[in-house]
Amino acid sequence: MVENTKKKKVEEIERCPECGSTNLIRDYEHGELVCGECGAVIEDAYIDQGPEWRAFDSEQNESRARAGSPMTYTIHDKGLSTDISWKNKDSYGRSIPTRNRAQLYRLRKWQKRIKVSNAAERNLSQALQELERMASNLSIPDDVKETAAVIYRKAVKQNMIRGRSIEGVVAGALYAACRITNVPRTLGEIASVTRVKKKEIGRTYRIMSRYLKLNIMPSKAEDYISRFCSKLKLSMDTRNKALEILRSAENAGLTSGKGPTGVAAAAIYIASLMTGERRTQRAVAEVAGVTEVTIRNRYKELTEKLQLNVEQ
């Protein structure tokens, strides 16, 4: 109910809460609702709520309504099972007699046990609950959760779970899904909602991508600009300047072999100095999940190679 209310509120947003502009950009690729004037990321879990079906004639158009929830990989039984209602009412809405409620209670209990009747199903159920928790804390869109669930299921089939914690494998699958769907989340952000160290998540992710042959393109520094700038409360001018610096750096071959978050952080830091919206290296480093040393190194490379006139 809370989730439905949240989605409704997102759909009803007409003005930017920061500057009041009505120029809102709905970026479905990255799951973000961005202000076109000041660059604020108003919502970072924005997804298209419209139907995914297509109709080619009037008959198909009439038959598009669903009789239930669609199949999903984020539930261990793919959402295909049914539950006995806890409302203690029959199909006509009449209350169940008191003498029959104990029997109904036992039926519910056994149905719940049967749904996860063996160790493999219990493992999968626990893992997908953990995935839901992580994704909720990071405001991950539903399509990314679906991708992560599919990756985890493949890892189970390949017997990659043995010797590893469920939480670590789920975290690796979620990070891989974010990379595949171009929804930028850093390893540090994933690690912040788990009890698994960032290094272990990275190792699990690399093993998964190799053995499952995941088609993952290298992440780009520009994918992180909008979210980092929004967290730092920087204007659209600073965001555009950071993107301009990044494009110049890419053309000059300065981003090759460098961590995208570090390059993005340095570009934002330089842009904030150039536009007069000064942010400290520490503030930028905390948002980007990198060290101040990384920002200083990237800052020096970019300003020298691109001959940028920046006053610190």
UniProtKB/Swiss-Prot annotation:
Q: Zinc fingers (TFIIB-type) span which residues?
A: 12-43
Q: What does the record list as GO biological process?
A: transcription preinitiation complex assembly
Q: Does the keyword RNA-binding apply?
A: no
- Keyword set for this entry? Metal-binding, Repeat, Transcription, Transcription regulation, Zinc, Zinc-finger
Q: Where are the transmembrane segments?
A: none
- List the record's Gene Ontology CC terms alphabetically: transcription preinitiation complex
- What positions does the entry give for Zn(2+) binding? 16, 19, 35, 38
Q: Which CDD domains match?
A: CYCLIN_TFIIB_archaea_like_rpt1, CYCLIN_TFIIB_archaea_like_rpt2
Gene Ontology MF, one:
TBP-class protein binding
Q: Where are the sequence repeats?
A: 129-212, 223-304
The record's function comment reads:
Stabilizes TBP binding to an archaeal box-A promoter. Also responsible for recruiting RNA polymerase II to the pre-initiation complex (DNA-TBP-TFIIB).
Q: Which family does it belong to?
A: Belongs to the TFIIB family.
Mind telling me what this protein is named? Transcription initiation factor IIB 1
Q: Which gene encodes it?
A: tfbA
